[in-house]
Amino acid sequence: TLTAGGDDFNSGIHIAEAIGGLVGTGAQTVQYLGRGSAQGQYSESYYVQFANGVSALYNTFTSTWQPFVVTIMTTKSSYSFKMDSSRLYEALLQEICCFMEHKPNRLADVPTLIESVKIMLAGAASRADGGSKVPLCDLSEDGPCYDGTAFWKNYAAASGPMYTL
């Protein structure tokens, strides 16, 4: 189970990337499970099924900050940890520097990043279709998508002058 807060894509994509980092590629379907709300805030839950039998559950919280929390359950034990959000970008920059210096690094490969986006798009398609299982291979340009321009404008408005033209 992976959890993030902020919005369904900006923070949610990092949860999908974390799933890829833990499980690898091979996601087959995503299913929207539902929404819970309280005091004007809401969370949504999604189920991801992989070809190798592994499954993942991720939750997004909209309009409220939540830490990145990961719980891994196996047939033998459970493990839970919270990512230190104050160090995430520092860690990413260190890995980018290693990559640029041709040193070993832990950056996600392109197939993992692409599958992360497909997981999010399949989740949006499932939500739009009332919670049906959506195969990643069935995604099309006609399905739900994310509006990069609208995202950038909202992000810039919330973040200040650094992100404006």
Sequence positions of predicted segments:
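C-terminal helix-rich "cap/oligomerization" subdomain common to oxidoreductases
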Residues: 102-165
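Short glycine/serine- and small hydrophobic-enriched flexible loop segments
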Residues: 20-21, 98, 122
